[in-house]
From Swiss-Prot:
GO molecular function: kinase activity
Protein name per UniProt: Uncharacterized protein Mb0510
Domain of life: Bacteria
Taxonomic placement: Bacteria, Bacillati, Actinomycetota, Actinomycetes, Mycobacteriales
Domain DAGKc: 68-205
Alphabetical list of Pfam families matching this protein: 4HBT_3, 4HBT_3C
Disulfide pattern: none
InterPro entries: ACOT8-like_C, Acyl-CoA_hotdog, Diacylglycerol_kinase_cat_dom, HotDog_dom_sf, Sec_Metab_Biosynth-Assoc, TesB_ACOT8-like_N
PANTHER family: CHROMOSOME 23, WHOLE GENOME SHOTGUN SEQUENCE, THIOESTERASE DOMAIN-CONTAINING PROTEIN
């Protein structure tokens, strides 16, 4: 099967309710190349929901095109790879902000409910340090922890997830994107602090876009690896912010947490592009795997 990210994000419009023009229905497919273990990758579903909201907004004749600047997703159950239906409803059409509801279903059962805020992300001029050269083009304030820790490209020795890789049995995204984690960062720090997981990623065959950047906001192995809990860690809720559209090249992903409890843990991702700009931030609540 085709493993291209653009294919995974493709949507086919289905018959919608003519009496409700704000509601549109699409069909998509996330195949085995977009799975973690036997189940569909949560970040891929977030990206697909975001695309459905964006597409529904455009289909309603709204101009200019808006991007999914925020996605708040609740995960009700984990679907299998295959065909999915996305039911969208535009809740607000505004001059700067619009809002859409999206339900991703499989077999008549809702797997993800997402509220997508559509707007215009930042457009900072490129700079080596992520800032622009002209007044008004740089962030007013930025505390970007990634640029000091991670180079724009993965160093030699940081290999992609694929056959023979330590994570290949769990992460099946290698056909569709090049994911290169620093395995040593999956462990807790020697002083007992939570892990600071580092990885690089880019889609194969195409440049990274807003949707791939959103997927990267859920790309790291769970931080529970640091406490030897490496089983299934289902995400319950995830919020993602698209801060800017990524430049072509590698995306740097930094994954951290505040607390791993007995039952619940939090996990944050910061995604930075080749130019050093923050393009996505996410925070999720998930369940700690059993021992």
């Amino acid at each position: 099967m085709n493993a291209l990210f653009t294919t995974a994000m493709a949507l086919r419009p289905l018959d919608s309710d003519p009496g409700n023009p704000a509601c549109r229905v699409f069909e998509g497919e996330l195949n085995e190349h977009w799975t973690i273990g036997p189940k569909v990758h949560g970040g891929a579903m977030v990206a697909l929901c975001a695309n459905a909201a964006r597409t529904a907004y455009g289909a309603a004749g709204q101009q200019p095109m808006r991007q999914p600047v925020a996605v708040s997703a609740s995960f009700l159950w984990a679907p299998d790879p295959g065909t999915m239906r996305l039911v969208t409803s535009i809740r607000k059409r505004g001059r700067r902000i619009s809002v859409a509801d999206v339900e991703l279903t499989q077999g008549g059962r809702t797997a993800v409910h997402a509220v997508v805020t559509l707007g215009e992300p930042e457009h900072f001029l490129p700079g080596v340090d992520g800032s622009g050269g002209a007044s008004g083009t740089a962030p007013l304030l930025s505390a970007n922890p990634v640029v000091e820790l991670m180079a724009p490209e993965p160093p030699e020795g940081v290999v992609p997830i694929g056959p023979g890789h330590q994570l290949a049995g769990l992460v099946h995204l290698g056909e569709g994107c090049d994911v290169r984690p620093v395995l040593s960062t999956l462990r807790s720090a020697t002083d007992g602090r939570p892990p600071v997981i580092q990885l690089w990623a880019r889609p194969r065959g195409v440049a990274p876009d807003a949707l791939f950047a959103l997927l990267c906001g859920d790309l790291s192995a769970p931080v529970t690896f640091a406490v030897d809990r490496t089983g299934w860690a289902p995400t319950v809720a995830l919020t993602a912010y698209l801060r800017a559209l990524p430049a072509d090249g590698w995306l740097r992903v930094l994954c951290t947490c505040v607390e791993i409890g007995q039952d619940w843990f939090d996990e944050d991702h910061i995604v930075v592009d080749r130019l050093g700009r923050i393009v996505v931030q996410t925070r999720q609540l998930a369940m700690v795997p059993a021992q």
